[in-house]
Amino acid sequence: MNKNIRNIIIVSLFTVGCGWLGIWLNNLTGNTAPPLQSLGALVWLTTPALSGFLLRAFGGDGWKDSGFGLNLPSGWMWYLLALLVYPLASLLTFGLAALFGILSADGFAVQGFGAYLSAAGVIFVGSLMKNFFEEFAWRSYLTPRLEAVGVKPILNHVIVGILWTSWHLPYYYYFLDRALLESAITTSIPVFIALAYVVQIPTSILFGELRLISKSTWTVFLLHQVINAVSMPLLMNGFIEVKGALAPIFTPTNEGVFVSLLFGVVGWMLMKYRLKQVGHA
């Protein structure tokens, strides 16, 4: 078997299995800590990225396409895109949801915008380690390595999106506090997970293409940080409320179908631009 394909399979298996291994370790050791602060959670969070690092160092992949460099100042516009794309997509979706009468923003009036900024800041800082390990697994390793073996761009992003969502399953079902999860979604948990596989594909197109066109993993790390910080307080802290059958589609959080479609459109445009540039190189 080609070593590049072998290494991709290894990281993929670790990605899908590490969370369940973490749960097993917690059960084996009789863990009494909150699940998200346990040894099992550490195994779940770090294994995909660490397996990629090890394969780059010792498995023959090398570091050339790892995206560790910032690619600044020449790549400044990709960092600007990372900062703006989700707030703009969320704002547009927010307006449509309000127009359809399914969204209330009374929480902003009651709590104040300062409270929202404070919550967003806490989440931004609290997400740093998680998003480092996520992005240095998916976009630092899987996306460029799939491209290196000749996988077409859309299939590349579909594969990464499916693995990305599958990695989250133990998080949703075990590590994350159930009440906290329910406060941040607009559907039942099974429906939320089914929709996650749908919305993660166009989201993966945006993340993957931004990573490839910027030649840096730090752009998508920043994008992930912004999405978590801006999105999570909206429902979880009660700043907005989205109700009705259209809620999963038009929630302005990153779990919303419409937001993910906007992500996919931007990602598609980046892909077309990138491939055009490659064709002219």
Describe the residue ranges of each PLM region:
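Functionally important transmembrane alpha-helices
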Residues: 20-21, 158, 183-250
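Membrane-helix interface linkers and caps
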Residues: 22, 26-82, 95-112, 145, ...
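Residue-level signature of the transmembrane alpha-helical core
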Residues: 16, 46, 83, 124, ...
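C-terminal membrane module of polytopic membrane proteins
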Residues: 225-281
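Alpha-helical transmembrane segments
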Residues: 7-19, 45-49, 81-90
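N-terminal membrane topogenic signal
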Residues: 1-12, 253
